[in-house]
């Protein structure tokens, strides 16, 4: 079993990408069997398996910080950081906590339990890294339900002013935010996250700016046209209007695609929401 090869953090990086669906199924089977005996949060964890796997594949713990809002969906995170054997005593006295707990593992960056706090904590970590000079990535995972909390929007407002990488993952389980569908949206999402698109956009801008007189005007009009199209086609413009780059939407059960998106997100010099 692939799951038996996961003994500590970052072991998932050794798993071939084509084997990720197998590992995801093994994790779900383990959760179903284990939680049927101990109880615990089942549905939220079954829905976040691939998301967690992709984050652990792209980022390096405990150096990088993953902050889970509420934290009840962190069971796969605990499994991938070497705590699988502790599930036999999950949520029992002296046993494994049902939420992230810093004293339990250095891979738990923040003690959670209440909702809408993860983005604020992430902003704090980013600011702390700037003060200390430490280099690490910060990821805040928040659900659409928790995003309704006012504290989350205050944090988004503060995050927009950061000039350092900060990844916010919106885990939309369709309980509060309507699903986005359509080939145009998927196409634009793929296009915007491709390095070739980013490079081409930069070259076109440089070339047009060299045109005497009308060059800068053409660049400005192209930007306005592009933004108008994005407003119609891409749901994340709300975040972009706040100054936070948006990448998505992404199928939360497509581990390979999420790995690709997170690899692009960690290169952004500033806040980015997936």
Where on the chain are the PLM-derived regions?
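N-terminal amphipathic, basic-rich helices that act as targeting or association modules
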Residues: 1-81, 238-262, 269-273
């Amino acid at each position: 079993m692939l799951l038996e090869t996961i003994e500590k953090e970052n072991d998932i990086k050794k798993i071939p990408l084509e084997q990720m669906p197998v590992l995801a199924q093994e994790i779900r089977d383990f959760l179903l069997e284990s939680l049927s005996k101990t109880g615990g949060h089942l549905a939220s964890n079954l829905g976040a398996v691939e998301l967690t796997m992709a984050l652990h594949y792209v980022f390096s713990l405990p150096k990088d910080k993953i902050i889970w809002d509420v934290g009840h969906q962190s069971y796969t995170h605990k499994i991938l950081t070497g705590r699988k054997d502790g599930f036999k005593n999950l949520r029992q006295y002296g046993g494994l906590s049902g939420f992230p707990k810093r004293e339990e593992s250095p891979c738990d960056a923040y003690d959670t339990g209440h909702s809408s706090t993860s983005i604020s904590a992430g902003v704090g970590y980013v600011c702390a890294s700037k003060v200390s000079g430490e280099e690490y990535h910060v990821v805040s995972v928040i659900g659409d339900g928790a995003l309704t909390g006012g504290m989350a929007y205050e944090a988004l407002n503060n995050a927009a002013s950061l000039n350092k990488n900060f990844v916010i993952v919106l885990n939309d389980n369709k309980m509060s935010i309507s699903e986005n569908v359509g080939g145009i949206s998927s196409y634009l999402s793929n296009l915007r996250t491709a390095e070739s698109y980013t490079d081409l956009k930069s070259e076109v801008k440089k070339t047009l700016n060299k045109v005497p007189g009308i060059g800068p005007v053409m660049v400005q009009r192209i930007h306005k046209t592009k933004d108008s199209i994005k407003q119609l086609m891409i749901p994340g413009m709300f975040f972009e209007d706040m100054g936070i780059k948006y990448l998505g939407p992404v199928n939360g059960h497509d581990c390979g695609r999420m790995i690709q998106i997170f690899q692009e997100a960690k290169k952004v010099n500033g806040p980015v929401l997936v």
